Swiss-Prot record:
Residues 1-25, 33-43 have a biased composition (Basic and acidic residues). GO terms for cellular component: cytoplasm; cytoskeleton. Plays an important role in the organization of the cytoskeleton. Binds to and sequesters actin monomers (G actin) and therefore inhibits actin polymerization. Residues 1-43 are annotated as: Disordered. It comes from Oncorhynchus mykiss. This is Thymosin beta-12. One of its GO terms (biological process) is regulation of cell migration. The modification N-acetylserine is found at S2.
Length: 43
């Protein structure tokens, strides 16, 4: 095992074998106001 990547594998990579996926929106982080409201609601 060598630490160097095998460039032959990379150059032979077939992009057509990849599946097309639907991009999902990432969850945005809550704002400070939202966090404070949740803290007060649970307190």
């Amino acid at each position: 095992m060598s630490d160097k990547p095998d460039l032959a594998e990379v150059s032979n990579f077939d992009k057509t074998k990849l599946k097309k996926t639907e991009t999902q929106e990432k969850n945005p982080l809550p704002t400070k106001e939202t966090i404070e409201q949740e803290k007060q609601a649970t307190a």
